[in-house]
Every structure is written in C-alpha cells, then in structure tokens.
Amino acid sequence: MLDIKKISTLSDLSELKTAYFAESTAPLDGMWHFGFVPMSDHFGFYENGNLVGYCVLNGEGYLLQFYLAPTASTHIENLFPLIVENNSSVIGEVKGAFVSMAEPQYLSLCVDNTESFKVNAMMYRQNSQARSDCDSDRIEEIEMSLATEEQLEQFVEFASSAIGAPKEWLTGYYSNLIARQELWGYIENNHVLATGECRKFDEHQTQFADLGMIVAQQERGKGLATRVLNFLKQHANSQGLEAMCSTESSNIGAQKAITRAGLSSKHRILQFDFSELKETD
C-alpha cells in the first residue's frame, strides 16, 4: 500500500534527491531545479511509513520532478498514470510536466502517457575543447565587475526594464547572488548595459557553474552577449568548473551568442500537456 503525503521539510528528501540527480545523464538546469523547485509543492510516496519517492508540482499544476526508488514495491509505471490522471486527492490536478532529455526515466513516463509536448528550452554545456580557450581568443574581452549591495537597486531596475521580471522577486534573487559574489555587471557612464551570473551549486552538480546574462535592449545584436558569456565561462574555468546554461527555444539571439561563446546543446527541456492522455488498457 502506497500513501502520498505533502512534505514541508525538504531536507527529508535529501537522499532521494541525491539519487535523482545521480540518474541524470547531463547536468540539470540550475534555475529550474534550484530556483523553481524549492518554491513548489513536494509530495512524498510512502510504503509502510518509509519514504520511497517523491514528486514536485509547481503552482500552475506542472510536475517538475518525479522519482521512485528502485527498492520500492510499487511500480513507477503504475504510479505515474495514477497521479497524472488526477486520481490523487492529496496532489490534486496535474496539468502537465516540465522534463529535460537528461532525465531518462521521468521523460519516458511522460512520453508513455501523452503525445502532446513542445520544446520549452535549450540546455547548453561547455564544449570539451573550449577549456583550452581556442574560441575565446577570437572574442573581444570585456571588463566586468562584481555587483555590490549598494548597486542592488540599480541592477533590479535594469533587469526589470530589460526582461520584465517582477522587482520584488529580482530584489531577493539578486541580493542572494551579490552575497555569494555570483552577480557581475558591465557598466558604462554609470549605466548598466549587461549583467552576468556565474552560479555555483551548493549540492549536486558541484563541478558545474550555471551561467546567466541579460543585455540591455539597445545593446543587443552587437556581440555583447557573447563577450559577457565568454567572461563568465573563463571565470568558471578559473575555479575549476565547467560552464553550463539554458535559454528559451524561441530566443534565437541568445542561442547564437551561447554557441559563439563555446557552449553547445544536446538536450532540451520539454513541456508536456496531460489534457490528452493516451488510452490505457
């Protein structure tokens, strides 16, 4: 008999999360798994009182993670359809799922249950030969400086204007990056023209650095994004870390900049829709 309960103490899932990341075939997106997942609802799967698995559901009804330990008596192929068919009163309505191609079991479960999906984002990681900086020699260097607490408001205003993100969320997000010395700025005449993020992982995937950048609207198309990413990649490499990042599938400009900076994409993040599930016998 399997019971499903909501989990409020995420540290209870530490061992299961470690196993989940160990099964991935490539580093998982930092913003999704360390930004969005902690803000979402977690549900534990219990057999005879023992925690044997979990899933994560965001506020919009989309699964972000799904895991069942191989030691569990329950078959994951039976549990997943039960949940996505909205048969769990604890979890409630599940509209769909976000899953990357680097999560083979979770991806297979989604594909088995619906044919309705679209590409949401492209996942990139540093080309192996890029460590020698063979590409970097052809990219104009850029002077970037670490953001300070005094610059927080200026950076928040810039990002809010450039990408339309909520200021309240940006304030908390950037404040944390500044404290960790992971937020950089490219500033001319006291105006922020670009920001760069080089985020380290506290647990799981600690050999990688997750990059992010924003370029001012009026500065786009001039090669600035490539220079920022190249700076961040070199900074990551100087600390013995491999660079990775992601971008929306519709952002062609960012994809070109990322490729020029020496990163390539083999995996995608897919968005599945469970409103049309496959017929099951």
Language-model-detected regions and their locations in the chain:
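Conserved hydrophobic beta-strand within the GNAT/NAT acetyltransferase core sheet
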Residues: 97-99, 211-213, 243-247
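Glycine/small-residue-rich hydrophobic helix-like segments
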Residues: 182-237
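Short amphipathic alpha-helix that is part of the acyltransferase structural core
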Residues: 1-28, 130-168
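…primarily DNA-binding HTH/wHTH and HhH modules…
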Residues: 255, 260-281
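Acyl-donor-binding surface of acyltransferase catalytic domains
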Residues: 58-62, 68-140, 272-273
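Conserved donor-binding loop and adjoining core beta-sheet/short helix segment
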Residues: 27-89, 193-209, 214-216
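Conserved acetyl-CoA-binding loop-helix of GNAT-fold acetyltransferases
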Residues: 73-86, 215, 221-236, 255-260
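Active-site rim helix/loop that mediates acceptor-substrate recognition in acyltransferases
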Residues: 21-42, 164-187
